[in-house]
Amino acid sequence: MGTQLSPAEVREFQETVGVEIAPDILTRALTHRSYAYENGGLPTNERLEFLGDSVLGLVVTDTLYRTHPDLSEGQLAKLRAAVVNMRALADVARELGIGRYVRLGRGEEATGGRDKSSILADTLEALIGAVYLDRGLDEASELVHRLFDPLIARASGLGAGLDWKTSLQELTAAELLGVPEYVVEESGPDHQKTFRATVRVAGQTYGSGEGRSKKEAEQQAAESAWKAIRAATEKAKQES
């Protein structure tokens, strides 16, 4: 790709996402910092990502507030976290095929950056920010609803998934396995860190997770562990 997306690339992307965005803003939304640094310091998508994160949070929070008048602030926060997290955003980005349009540097390209969850999630937020900047809040809100309303509906019926750490601790206590232990590692620049967590129960690693915060990574790891332990205990009961 050159410094700008070609007209054909712009049309193809707009048809994929279902929204029109000015080519220069769209190009910026798809420009990862690795590509920018390798091409003379072009503008990156990080400012648009910052903007899109806020727009996404606002629309999802507003929807949850209006559709769940019976829930407390804490319950609403857990619902929002189940919808707005790196894994969920990356999954939506994969469904849209955003990875093939991201402008990456050679290093990121070589290490599978087009399917890296952190890059996909960041790019989706930058895209939402671009729609807001170019088309306004109404169209940005429409895009968020189209992409995330199914996740919001699923989150409302998650049960254990609203707080995987608590659910995991309850499960391990019931199975007399002891208290889960978490180990968290971080990588990336200070303003854009990625956290990776692993969880051990009774000396055995049961799950891992990745997120933009320690809390998010631990929740993802707890989810993996909860599902693994639940499956193992169900299998043991069937065999006994």
From Swiss-Prot:
Start and end residues of each RNase III domain: 10-136
Main location: cytoplasm
Cofactor: Mg(2+)
Subcellular location field: Cytoplasm
InterPro entries per UniProt: dsRBD_dom, RNase_III, RNase_III_dom, RNase_III_sf
Residue positions of the active site: 53, 125
CDD domains: DSRM_RNAse_III_family, RIBOc
A Gene Ontology cellular-component term: cytoplasm
EC number: 3.1.26.3
Keywords: Cytoplasm, Endonuclease, Hydrolase, Magnesium, Metal-binding, mRNA processing, Nuclease, RNA-binding, rRNA processing, rRNA-binding, tRNA processing
Any one biological process term the GO annotation gives: mRNA processing
Skewed-composition ranges (Low complexity): 219-228
The UniProt record lists the keyword Hydrolase: yes
Binding positions (Mg(2+)): 49, 122, 125
Disordered: annotated segments: 205-240
Catalytic activity: Endonucleolytic cleavage to 5'-phosphomonoester
Molecular function via GO: double-stranded RNA binding; metal ion binding; ribonuclease III activity; rRNA binding
Domain DRBM, residue spans: 163-231
Family the UniProt entry places it in: Belongs to the ribonuclease III family.
Subunit field text: Homodimer.
Described function: Digests double-stranded RNA. Involved in the processing of primary rRNA transcript to yield the immediate precursors to the large and small rRNAs (23S and 16S). Processes some mRNAs, and tRNAs when they are encoded in the rRNA operon. Processes pre-crRNA and tracrRNA of type II CRISPR loci if present in the organism.
Full protein name: Ribonuclease 3
